[in-house]
Amino acid sequence: MSHDVTATKLTHEHVQRWLDDYAKAWDTYDGDDVRALFSRDAEYRWHPADDPEKGRETIVDAWLNPGGNASTRDVPGTYKADLRPFAVDGNRAVAVGTCTYWTDATRSKVERIYYNNWLLEFDDDGKCSSFTEYYMTPRKS
């Protein structure tokens, strides 16, 4: 999953590949898939005001064993991420999109939707060195 960006500038295409790899890691909950996303000293904020999870192995552990700042482990087949890069500047990117959750794996009834804004920073090897998640739910009618 490493996408070397040292020779070239970070692009929308690189960020989209990273987002696709993130969605795959979320689907698999495979430690190696998660590990491949982040730099050794990465920081991950589940919410903007949280103290970050610090270090790749701490991030992997938080994904695989939720608690604390991480919520719960999602049931396979009950969620889907639809994310895309919105802006890329230097080694920073903003991604936007939705994460949809269904009541069960049949995906017949939507339980909730989150609108996402992710602030991302990448190192020269194309790994995320800083991740901050902002999300909101639809307005109530």
Located regions from the model:
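Short solvent-exposed loop/turn micro-motifs enriched in small/polar/acidic residues
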Residues: 17, 77-79, 112-114
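Short, low-complexity N-terminal intrinsically disordered segments enriched in polar/charged residues
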Residues: 1-40
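Short beta-strand edge/turn micro-motifs at domain boundaries
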Residues: 113-141
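A solvent-exposed, acidic/Ser-Thr-rich amphipathic alpha-helical stretch
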Residues: 12, 31-93, 98
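Short, cysteine-centered beta-strand-loop-beta hairpins and adjacent loop/turn segments enriched
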Residues: 101-112
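Short, well-ordered beta-to-alpha junction loops that form the rim of enzyme active sites
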Residues: 97-99, 133-134
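Hydrophobic beta-strand positions in extracellular immunoglobulin-like domains
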Residues: 99-101, 122
